[in-house]
Amino acid sequence: MRFHPPLEEGRLIRRYKRFLADIETVGGELLTIHCPNTGSMLNCQVEGGQVWFSRSNDPKRKLPGTWEVGETPQGRLFCVNTGRANALVEEALQAGVINELNGFTGLKREVAYGQEKSRIDFRLDYPTGPAYVEVKSVTLGFDGTAVAAFPDAVTERGAKHLRELAHLARDGIRAVQLYCVNLTGVEAVRPAEEIDFAYAAALREAVACGVEVLAYGVRLSHEEMVIDRRLDVLLNG
């Protein structure tokens, strides 16, 4: 997935109210842009850090741009825009990059399902039956380690999705939790038990019920991003 039009560069002044970020472009222009990330962005955002953003010329938009990519204090790149994860995964599915999910004959997005009135990111249809795939974007990393973690803030919604997947697996339906790691320099993923114990417990319970857990890494630059490798999943940290 290439960024089109090309991203522009700037530096972060501050992020606030979750969805807003003040930046200064390389040309000295001060802008308030959209921050499309509901998480804490722990260990990612730093005042004065480099940012890359897409600019919109749509007069109906309230904000002139969207924060897409940033650089952590450790020099890693991360994708701010969590909405990119589903598009990346779909691109990888269609290209056959995610080997464990190859062979599907149909793909549907945002399908209603479950006991708690949820929507699954992807339902893949196979001759043997469907597979339900939930996608999460991961950006939380730590100094001196190549292990990323999820979530970066307490997420009841994320735990709910795991419960829904567990219900499917108990009924003999294939259910998959897929972590799309939008952070460079990562080799494995673990649940962030120190941030959300309930989510970590729900993940382990889901696995015990038969839910498959996959993690894939993204090759990321300010020009393009593409899923290119499988990562290890460390359920016990």
Curated annotation (Swiss-Prot):
Alphabetical list of Gene3D superfamilies matching this protein: 2.40.50.580, 3.40.1350.60
Source organism: Pseudomonas fluorescens (strain Pf0-1)
Family: Belongs to the SfsA family.
GO molecular function terms noted in the UniProt entry: DNA binding
InterPro entries on file: SfsA, SfsA_C, SfsA_N
Classification lineage: Bacteria, Pseudomonadati, Pseudomonadota, Gammaproteobacteria, Pseudomonadales
Pfam families: SfsA, SfsA_N
Name of this chain's protein: Sugar fermentation stimulation protein homolog
